[in-house]
Amino acid sequence: MSVNNHKDRPSNVPVLRRAAMDFLARREHSIYELKQKLFTKYPDSTLRDLQTALDELRRENLQSDRRFAECYVRYRKSKGFAYKHIRADLFSRGVHTDIVNDYLSSQDPDWQVMANSIIDKKIPNSNEIVYGSKQHRRLVRFLESRGFLLCEIQEAVYRNIKLIST
């Protein structure tokens, strides 16, 4: 973004606003995401014009980080991602901690249900796995990569798989 705020330069606010609305028409965006996308698309825009366009959208409730967080959490949960992963994603998209905490809780009982469901899908026919085996380690790593807490992983493995020690 150009910090060059020339007074003789025409305002770019309507163009920025229209572009932001086009992005928002496709899906909800955090304010941080919109800033990044608009900066990439219109690198010569002034900071003032960009901020003015985004402030207007927020004032008119066309952009809301709360709405974005709510939609994002629901979407990522539907794709099998859990607390730690979704939380990190929201922070990387510039969503404030208070908003993240309002829409995401590590105590949500859905996480355990999701972990159980994932194990059922990953190992549908086999209910016995050797503890510490390649298959066991792979399953634990997969659940960790999805953002499940260790206690959820252990509980899901314990409930759904008979671990055999060698």
Predicted region positions:
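An alpha-helical, amphipathic repeat domain used for nucleic-acid recognition
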Residues: 1-166
